[in-house]
Amino acid sequence: MKTLIAAYSGVLRGERRAEAARSENKNKGSALSREGSGRWGTGSSILSALQDIFSVTWLNRSKVEKHLQVISVLQWVLSFLVLGVACSVILMYTFCTDCWLIAALYFTWLAFDWNTPKKGGRRSQWVRNWAVWRYFRDYFPIQLVKTHNLLTTRNYIFGYHPHGIMGLGAFCNFSTEATEVSKKFPGIRPYLATLAGNFRMPVLREYLMSGGICPVNRDTIDYLLSKNGSGNAIVIVVGGAAESLSSMPGKNAVTLRNRKGFVKLALRHGADLVPTYSFGENEVYKQVIFEEGSWGRWVQKKFQKYIGFAPCIFHGRGLFSSDTWGLVPYSKPITTVVGEPITVPKLEHPTQKDIDLYHTMYMEALVKLFDNHKTKFGLPETEVLEVN
């Protein structure tokens, strides 16, 4: 009996020791679990903190990018509006200071270099590839769409439509490499033609020439199409100042019916005509439209007749806020579509019938280009290009 009791007691003691061991192991496991949980919790906190840092950094970088885009656009707008006049005033003032020699040397250089713009100017690939133009492009954004290849053995006249207020799409696509025009049209040298008066402005003329911009006059175009080899593409904003007066958001209209000079030049040199339309060019600024017969329109037409440009009362957004008015254009997409070239024969003395024929072909090609692409860029199928 004693033996049985002793054995039973031993079993009980063994069970108690086993239970105690299990309890101890459980407590250790709980401690390890809490310790591990703490370690993993700390890791999660660090990971979360890093994600927050990267998120803030990305947001800050995004804001910096946006500010750089606004500044890049504003510098071009101010250059377009006031750089020429400002530099002229500064140089004239410099003549009255101890630095008069600088102004004298520049004007001496200007006298020797006066005719350079008429021969295509001095384009600089370095200037055309400035990073500022990529920020300029991304602000809207602006893109260039190629529909057909261009032969390097031919010369071309691109008709650019519409003018808009400043022709921002024309500048970005053809006077910079931001949209890779040279890669899309290898072997083609684009020359954006603008008012000849801009090349009488000191410093501004150098800035324009560096981008491949030239005067829009007969002497310059004759030189580029006859004495500058092949592969030249003269980009002419056909509607000019008259077209800018009707520029407003939501309107697709071009001034073209009575603009035939560019067709005559194409025939005289056998340069192919290339219709080009920029969707969104009219969306980036709002302007006051004066009715025909009003005093405002009278003033605009007088400026256009005697000076070559028509002053517009327009506005975009403010520098620091899109909710205020200012000179910064609205951030709206601009897509420039380059159409199929129209083969033009070389006729030294084209008749009016020849000019009318190719002018009609050009108008039809432009309307077709517009109709084929309008729905791709947010316009309804019912939208019609107004040709004035």
Curated annotation (Swiss-Prot):
It catalyses: an acyl-CoA + a 1,2-diacyl-sn-glycerol = a triacyl-sn-glycerol + CoA; all-trans-retinol + an acyl-CoA = an all-trans-retinyl ester + CoA; 2-(9Z-octadecenoyl)-glycerol + (9Z)-octadecenoyl-CoA = 1,2-di-(9Z-octadecenoyl)-sn-glycerol + CoA; 1,2-di-(9Z-octadecenoyl)-sn-glycerol + (9Z)-octadecenoyl-CoA = 1,2,3-tri-(9Z-octadecenoyl)-glycerol + CoA. It comes from the Eukaryota. Residues 89-92 are lumenal. The keyword Membrane applies. CDD domains: LPLAT_MGAT-like. Pathway: Glycerolipid metabolism; triacylglycerol biosynthesis. Keywords: Acyltransferase, Cytoplasm, Endoplasmic reticulum, Glycerol metabolism, Lipid biosynthesis, Lipid droplet, Lipid metabolism, Membrane, Transferase, Transmembrane, Transmembrane helix. Its main location: endoplasmic reticulum. The keyword Disulfide bond does not apply. Essential acyltransferase that catalyzes the terminal and only committed step in triacylglycerol synthesis by using diacylglycerol and fatty acyl CoA as substrates. Required for synthesis and storage of intracellular triglycerides. Probably plays a central role in cytosolic lipid accumulation. In liver, is primarily responsible for incorporating endogenously synthesized fatty acids into triglycerides. Also functions as an acyl-CoA retinol acyltransferase (ARAT). Also able to use 1-monoalkylglycerol (1-MAkG) as an acyl acceptor for the synthesis of monoalkyl-monoacylglycerol (MAMAG). PANTHER family: DIACYLGLYCEROL O-ACYLTRANSFERASE (PTHR12317), DIACYLGLYCEROL O-ACYLTRANSFERASE 2 (PTHR12317:SF14). Forms multimeric complexes consisting of several DGAT2 subunits. Interacts with SLC27A1 and this interaction is enhanced in the presence of ZFYVE1. This is Diacylglycerol O-acyltransferase 2.
